[in-house]
Amino acid sequence: DFIEKMSEYTASGKIYNRISSSLLRAFDGLKQMLDPIKEAGLFELRIYEGQNEDAVRRKIKMFNEEEITLFNKVGLPPIFFSKMIVGPYQPSLVYMLNFRDLEHRNETWNTFINHPEWKVMSSKEEYKNTVSNIRKIFLEKV
């Protein structure tokens, strides 16, 4: 039965470019996925790569102890925060935010990066050099 169904599935030609799988572990600061905001139309998946495991550990600490709170304060609506256990771009962490649209996203990020609490936390010595590369993937609601 599986083989028969598989032939129907692949008969339509190219279905996708590639498949990539990952295993993620939730941060202590947000242990469960949250529902998107009601008017969500844009999702931003962010992958923060670290130069080594210690850099990622320190960035996760920053999120758990300070940054997630500030995200909520300025209205950066999260879906999840996680450490990548298995997958590409290791060592890394992955999180997803959601917005009404690109304008809402840009306004909210601007509020965040100009917030006095962000300026203080991002200048702390323990959080220096925690991210070596940021990958952003934008997804639209269909």
Label each region the model flagged.
Residues 1-118, 126-142:
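Short S/T/G/P-rich N-terminal loop/turn motif that feeds into the first structured element of a domain
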